[in-house]
Amino acid sequence: MTYIIYAFAAVFEIAGCFAFWAWLKLEKPAWWLAPGMISLALFAWLLTLVPSDAAGRTFAAYGGIYILASLSWLWLIEGRVPDRYDIGGGLICLAGASVILFAPRA
């Protein structure tokens, strides 16, 4: 269930950040900020649903998912194919996130 929450959180975070990017860098109208802010609020709320007692650990584990989701956004939304360094780096980050997420803790 945690990975599903992280996946949805990533979509909302990336969409929210992209709304700001589009407004500032792509000269989209200011109304793009409203759905961006809503999306970022949903992202933050979703992370509170992760079953963890430590926010920092939750955010660190989420980081690997965020990187893979960002590379997917690069490919699917922006139309730029990730290169081998993007993919390799993403896999390394996902491995690190998995260690954080699945480590046995008392």
Swiss-Prot record:
Annotated organism of origin: Rhizobium etli (strain ATCC 51251 / DSM 11541 / JCM 21823 / NBRC 15573 / CFN 42)
GO cellular component, one term: plasma membrane
Transmembrane regions listed in the UniProt entry: 4-24, 30-50, 59-79, 86-106
InterPro entries in alphabetical order: UPF0060
First and last residue of the signal peptide: none
Stated family: Belongs to the UPF0060 family.
Keyword annotations: Cell inner membrane, Cell membrane, Membrane, Transmembrane, Transmembrane helix
Protein name as annotated: UPF0060 membrane protein RHE_CH01408
Keyword Membrane: yes
Localization annotation: Cell inner membrane
NCBIfam families: PRK02237.1
Main location: membrane
Membrane topology: Multi-pass membrane protein
